[in-house]
C-alpha cells in the first residue's frame, strides 16, 4: 500500500518519520513537497533546461470567464487542475470550444469542487503517449530503471483509471523507439 494526497505525497509523513528517526523508502521530504506543488515542480524543470508545457498559476478567486478567455487565446487546448494535489483530482482537459463553453458555464461549480485549493494551474495540453520513468537513488547516484507507458480506458489517466481494476494498462517496457526510450531515461535523471 502507498499513501496518497496531502500527508501522503507532500512530504509531511516523511517529515514525521525523519523527526522520529524511523527509516522509510521512496522520496525524501524535499522531493515529495516539490513534486506535490505542480508550479514549483515546473519552475525546477524549466530551471534545469527541460521542456515543459506553458502554464499559468492563478489564485482560485481569480478564476473567471474573462481570465479563461484570455488564457484560451494563448493556449488553444489546456489542462486545468489544482496546483497542490495528486491522483488526478480536479483535472479538466479543454480541447475544443464545446468543452470550453461547458467550463465557462460551470465555473462556479468547478471552483466549489476545488474549495480546499487556493491555487489553480492551467497548462498547455499536449497530446501523446503517457510515459513514466522509475528512478532509484543508490550510493548518492540516481539511476533510471525503466520507461513505462500508461494507457487509460478513459480520456486520460484519471482517478478512476489509477485506482479501479481494468481501467489502465502499464506497458513495460514502453512501446517507443529506442532513441525515445533512451532519451526518457536520460531526462529522468537530469
Q: Which role does the model predict for each range below?
A:
Residues 1-59:
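Conserved N-proximal alpha/beta basic substrate-recognition cap immediately N-terminal to
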Residues 22, 85, 162-164:
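Short connector loops/turns at beta-strand edges and beta->alpha or beta->beta junctions
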Residues 26, 88-89, 168-172:
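Short small-residue beta-strand/loop micro-motif enriched in glycine and branched aliphatics
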Residues 34-128:
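Active-site nucleotide/adenylate-binding loops and adjacent lid/helix of ATP-dependent enzymes
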Residues 95-179, 183:
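Phosphate-binding site of ATP-dependent enzymes
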Residues 183, 187-190:
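C-terminal active-site/capping subdomain that shapes the small-molecule cofactor and substrate pocket
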Amino acid at each position: 500500500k502507498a499513501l496518497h494526497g496531502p500527508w501522503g505525497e507532500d512530504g509531511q509523513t516523511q517529515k514525521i518519520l525523519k523527526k522520529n528517526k524511523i527509516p522509510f523508502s521512496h522520496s525524501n521530504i524535499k522531493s515529495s513537497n516539490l513534486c506535490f506543488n505542480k508550479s514549483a515542480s515546473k519552475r525546477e524543470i524549466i530551471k534545469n533546461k527541460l521542456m515543459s508545457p506553458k502554464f499559468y498559476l492563478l489564485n482560485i478567486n481569480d478564476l473567471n470567464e474573462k481570465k479563461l478567455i484570455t488564457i484560451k487565446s494563448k493556449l488553444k487546448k489546456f489542462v486545468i487542475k489544482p496546483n497542490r494535489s495528486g491522483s488526478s483530482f480536479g483535472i479538466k482537459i479543454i480541447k475544443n470550444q464545446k468543452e470550453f463553453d461547458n467550463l465557462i458555464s460551470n465555473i462556479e461549480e468547478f471552483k466549489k469542487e476545488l474549495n480546499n485549493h487556493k491555487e489553480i494551474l492551467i497548462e498547455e495540453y499536449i497530446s501523446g503517449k503517457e510515459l513514466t520513468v522509475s528512478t532509484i537513488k543508490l550510493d548518492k547516484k540516481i539511476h533510471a530503471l525503466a520507461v513505462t507507458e500508461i494507457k487509460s480506458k478513459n480520456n486520460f489517466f484519471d482517478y478512476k483509471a489509477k485506482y479501479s481494476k481494468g481501467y489502465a494498462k502499464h506497458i513495460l517496457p514502453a512501446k517507443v523507439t529506442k532513441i525515445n526510450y533512451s532519451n526518457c531515461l536520460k531526462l529522468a535523471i537530469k
